[in-house]
């Protein structure tokens, strides 16, 4: 049974009333079902089996009250202790959850190893996400799109090179880097169904040019905490089509 209550519920938007504080003993994550950054927090909550209430936010029509949860009005935002504590930012929330719910521990407790994981995340995630969103923004401009597709392939070349074992954690289990980069890579998988000449291939994603990443993606894609926080591929592809043309349907599939 999933610990994530409300994951597949319709968005709240401007004009909707603010929810009551989260119940004692639970956390609340403000989310958007297709957002890779919010999925980072959901994965950690699912993995640690934390009773979690999920509230989905309409990112184009944000409720005024949501800016009291995140000053930029972004997801994810974490609320707990009956609303007394709020934590924001997609790389900060997982670390916070790892500290207050330490079983199972994901981030190394050794200070040096912890720093190395954060540096690796910064190197891989920054390049992958920048290249991917560059492609999406250029999707309707053919000359620019070709340039951005080359940049995306280079970003995946780097990710392939930096994967030296089964996982970026350097252990036999996925870790901080694996869980935090997976959502953006999953969005690239969805987009590979849509954009012509996409350098990442649907079959054995991201394709034969990335043999280590293909095995890594297959491993991550089959673990319970990823399955529990992901949307069906067919649904996600249709959402991304609406997003790419600038008319995102945040409730698609509900």
Swiss-Prot record:
It catalyses: RX + glutathione = an S-substituted glutathione + a halide anion + H(+); L-dehydroascorbate + 2 glutathione = glutathione disulfide + L-ascorbate; methylarsonate + 2 glutathione + H(+) = methylarsonous acid + glutathione disulfide + H2O. Signal peptide: none annotated. GO terms for biological process: glutathione metabolic process. One of its GO terms (cellular component) is cytoplasm. Its EC number is 2.5.1.18, 1.8.5.1, 1.20.4.2. Keywords: Oxidoreductase, Repeat, Transferase. Pfam families: GST_C, GST_N_3. Glutathione binds at residues 62, 75, 89-90. InterPro entries: Glutathione-S-Trfase_C-like, Glutathione-S-Trfase_C_sf, Glutathione_S-Trfase, Glutathione_S-Trfase_N, GST_C, GST_omega, GST_Omega/HSP26, Thioredoxin-like_sf. Residues 110-239 form the GST C-terminal domain. GO terms for molecular function: glutathione dehydrogenase (ascorbate) activity; glutathione transferase activity; methylarsonate reductase activity. The active site is at residue 35. The keyword Cell division does not apply. It comes from the Eukaryota. Residues 25-105 form the GST N-terminal domain. PANTHER family: GLUTATHIONE S-TRANSFERASE OMEGA-RELATED (PTHR43968:SF12), PTHR43968. Belongs to the GST superfamily. Omega family. Exhibits glutathione-dependent thiol transferase activity. Has dehydroascorbate reductase activity and may contribute to the recycling of ascorbic acid. Participates in the biotransformation of inorganic arsenic and reduces monomethylarsonic acid (MMA). This is Probable glutathione transferase omega-2. It comes from Caenorhabditis elegans. The gene is gsto-2.
């Amino acid at each position: 049974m999933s610990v994530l209550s409300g994951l597949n519920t319709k968005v709240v938007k401007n004009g909707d009333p603010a929810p009551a504080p989260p119940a004692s003993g639970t956390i609340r994550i403000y989310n958007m079902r297709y957002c890779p950054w919010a999925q980072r927090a959901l994965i950690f909550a699912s993995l640690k089996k934390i009773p979690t209430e999920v509230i989905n936010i309409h990112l184009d029509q944000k409720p005024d009250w949501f800016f009291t949860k995140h000053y930029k009005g972004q997801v994810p935002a974490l609320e707990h202790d009956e609303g007394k504590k709020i934590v924001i930012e997609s790389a900060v929330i997982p670390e916070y959850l790892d500290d207050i719910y330490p079983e199972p521990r994901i981030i190394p407790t050794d200070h040096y190893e912890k720093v190395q994981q954060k540096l690796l995340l910064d190197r891989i995630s920054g390049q992958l996400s920048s290249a991917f969103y560059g492609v999406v923004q250029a999707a309707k401009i053919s000359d620019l799109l070709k340039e951005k597709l080359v940049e995306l392939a280079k970003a995946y070349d780097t990710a392939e090179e930096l994967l030296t074992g089964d996982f970026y954690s350097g252990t036999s289990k996925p870790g901080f880097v694996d869980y935090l980069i997976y959502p953006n890579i999953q969005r690239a998988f969805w987009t590979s169904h849509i954009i012509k000449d996409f350098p990442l291939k649907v079959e054995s994603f991201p394709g034969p040019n990335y043999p280590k990443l293909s095995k890594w993606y297959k491993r991550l894609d089959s673990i319970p905490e990823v399955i529990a926080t992901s949307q069906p591929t067919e649904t996600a592809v249709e959402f991304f089509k609406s997003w790419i043309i600038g008319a995102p349907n945040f409730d698609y599939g509900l």
